[in-house]
Structure formats: C-alpha cells, structure tokens
Amino acid sequence: MKKANFFKVNELKAKKVLEDSTLRVVTNENTMVSFFEFGPNTTIMPKHKHPHEQTGVVITGSVKMVVGGETKILKVSEGVVIPPNVEHEATPLEPGTKMIDFFYPIREDYLK
C-alpha cells in the first residue's frame, strides 16, 4: 500500500527563479503542485509555453495573465486553466503575489 506524502510548504526546498522569485514543488507519481512567490524585483514571468497542462490559482495579491492572446486580471482565489502548448505570461500587480500551479505531467525542469 502506498503512503501519503504530508508536507509543509515552507519546508519544501526553495529554488530561486527569474530575478528574485521563489519556486517550491511537491510531486506525486503523475502530478506536480508548485508554490510560486513573485519577488519584489520580478516584473514578469516571460511569455513561454510547455507541453504540460497547467492550472494556476492566485493565493495572495493579483496578477495579469496573458494566455493565448487573451488578457485577464486575476485576484485572490481566481485562476486559469492553460492547455498544453499555449503561450502565456504573468505579471504580478502587487508585492508578494503568490500562486499555486498544478501540472500534468510533472515538469522535470522544475525538479533540477
């Protein structure tokens, strides 16, 4: 029988990304959850795409999302579902903006 993986977000290994943002991840066999905190000097998560399904939810602050050419402002408890291979970017609109992202399959690049 497989066991549950209990964790505390603040105890997950922190990885510095972009200029001064922080990424923490936890994985299961097929899925990944990332906890992303925009740093005070990070002005944008540049436009990119990947083969993973992604669902993101704002948990603190607000963010301007551009997904497939469509722009929306997301506030706390609002989110977006991004299909695979669709270009997207995120711009934090408040200091300390945080998001939780769910990925399928696991993003191996986030584990490095």
Predicted regions and their residues:
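Short, conserved beta-strand element in jelly-roll/cupin
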Residues: 38-39, 49-65
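Short strand-coil-strand connectors
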Residues: 29, 66-70
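Short acidic-glycine-tyrosine-enriched beta hairpin
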Residues: 70-84
